């Protein structure tokens, strides 16, 4: 991550990352401060925007991951370090919105094959194990590419917003 815009600009200009890029604050929510950078000329404004939404004055730059199908939204629960429940949804976006990274809807159930969902589950479990996460609820934002590689965009130790926990309860009875 970065706290210094000039350091981030230097890394971007030196080719540390391949375009397009995603710039976002490390500690924001609701996709506030998230933007896509397609050319170096857009970088400084995006970096300033991300920092303006960061409580800790820190941002990250990452390469954009092209999703296959829908972005995965979901919630989960771990007890004693084991992910015992998770439910995934299809995130829907509208490029006409002011911030196209904010989901406008979610549909259940997630429409990828069970083996892909199991791969997502295993990837989340690996992260929880590596971080020593024990007992918590989680909110997930995940992308799967055309080769079924799993990219954890965000795993936050909290319930999802936008009534996702209630929708999951109606969909699963849990």
Model-inferred region functions:
Residues 1-60, 109-122, 126:
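Active-site nucleotide/adenylate-binding loops and adjacent lid/helix of ATP-dependent enzymes
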Residues 23, 153, 172:
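Single, functionally critical "micro-switch" positions that shape active/binding sites
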Residues 28-31, 158-159, 171:
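Short glycine/serine/threonine-biased micro-segments
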Residues 33-35, 164-167:
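A short secondary-structure junction signal
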Residues 50-58, 65-110, 118-152, 156-164:
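Phosphate-binding core of ATP-grasp and ATP-grasp-like enzymes
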Residues 168-174:
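Gly/Ser/Thr-rich active-site loops/lids in small-molecule metabolic enzymes
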């Amino acid at each position: 991550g970065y706290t210094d815009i000039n350091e981030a600009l230097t890394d971007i200009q030196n080719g540390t990352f391949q375009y397009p890029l995603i710039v976002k604050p490390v500690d924001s929510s609701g996709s506030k401060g998230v933007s896509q950078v397609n050319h170096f000329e857009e970088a400084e404004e995006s970096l300033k925007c991300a920092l303006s939404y960061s409580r800790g004055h820190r941002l990250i730059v990452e390469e954009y991951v092209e999703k296959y199908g829908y972005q995965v939204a979901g919630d989960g629960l771990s007890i004693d370090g084991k992910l015992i429940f998770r439910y995934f949804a299809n995130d829907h976006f509208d490029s006409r919105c002011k911030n196209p990274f904010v989901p406008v809807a979610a549909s259940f159930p997630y429409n990828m094959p069970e083996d892909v969902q199991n791969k997502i589950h295993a990837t989340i479990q690996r992260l929880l194990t590596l971080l020593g996460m024990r007992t918590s609820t989680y909110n997930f934002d995940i992308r799967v590419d055309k080769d079924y590689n799993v990219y954890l965009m965000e795993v936050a130790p909290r319930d999802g917003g936008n009534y996702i926990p209630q929708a999951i309860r109606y969909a699963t009875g849990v």
